């Protein structure tokens, strides 16, 4: 078997070999070679076979000028390895020349040399880097193949492991439960306190039952009633203010016709009305006297009270106008005092200050 050695062109690693173009090229060269044989039939009779081979250019019937490894691999991937022979068999019988048989023997030897290699084309193609494929797509393809090769149980376990969260300690769970219970108890206690205070504010008629819902509903109804009462009171206040303003206007109109001197005399007359008030608490007497101012009236009154066994402890004098005076006595009843009630003391004071009884 002959060994073929030659330079491997690196450009074949960057592209997939085009098998169809090789087939078409071989077919075209075979037809051109057949055409030349028809034109030179006369040479077969005159020139010996060896001279004819020496005179011909080997490039005219060898389609592969520099055989390399990738070209041989592309020839191996054909469904029927020697489709070129099938195309040539359909032509004229002139293709079965010694030159064609030599090319066939050359191709068969190349096929045997390639088939002796243990690397299949699919694996070689897989290992070759592609210019169009990106590193991300290669990584995804490799991941898909690995996932496809793994059994389904292992993939499910991986998914379950991803979904599982880190389990908490029993102490943390117990602490969370205790905190939740404490917060809930505090909330219920505050709610019960608010409900009880609200129930105390409501009238009994608004509480039908003792549950929380009835208490809250009664409070809502009671607030609505209070709003209505406030609205009615505000309306009454407005009407009262209007009526008071009318009364004041009438009084001002009436006073506008009265002179200032007459108004002063009427005020003095109202203040000069005599008044006597007596209050008895055990043996103490509180006496208030309002009367017309007279000369020596106070001294005469104190002497008269001493005769009635009423001792003056404190005295306060106020003058409200030019003609009236007000006395406030704080008296003590002696044991020999014959007066016992407030009415008796009032009658005696009327006689002392010459105030007529009403």
Swiss-Prot record:
Q: Which Gene3D superfamilies match?
A: Helix-loop-helix DNA-binding domain
SMART domains tied to this protein: HLH
User: In which residue ranges is the amino acid composition biased (Basic residues)?
Assistant: 157-166
InterPro entries in UniProt: bHLH-TF_ACT-like_plant (IPR054502), bHLH_dom (IPR011598), FAMA/SPEECHLESS/MUTE-like (IPR044283), HLH_DNA-bd_sf (IPR036638)
One annotated Gene Ontology cellular component of this protein: nucleus
Region Disordered, annotated ranges: 125-176
- TM region(s), chain numbering: none
CDD domains per UniProt: bHLH_AtFAMA_like
Compartment(s) where it occurs, according to its Swiss-Prot or TrEMBL record: Nucleus
**Keywords from the UniProt entry:** DNA-binding, Nucleus, Transcription, Transcription regulation
Looking at the Swiss-Prot or TrEMBL record, what is one Pfam family this protein matches? HLH
Principal localisation = nucleus
Gene Ontology MF, one: DNA-binding transcription factor activity
Q: Which GO terms describe its biological process?
A: cold acclimation; guard cell differentiation; regulation of DNA-templated transcription
* Tissue distribution: Expressed constitutively in roots, leaves, stems, and flowers.
Which stretches make up the bHLH domain?
175-226
Q: Quaternary state and partners of this protein? A: Homodimer.
Q: What is this protein called?
A: Transcription factor bHLH67
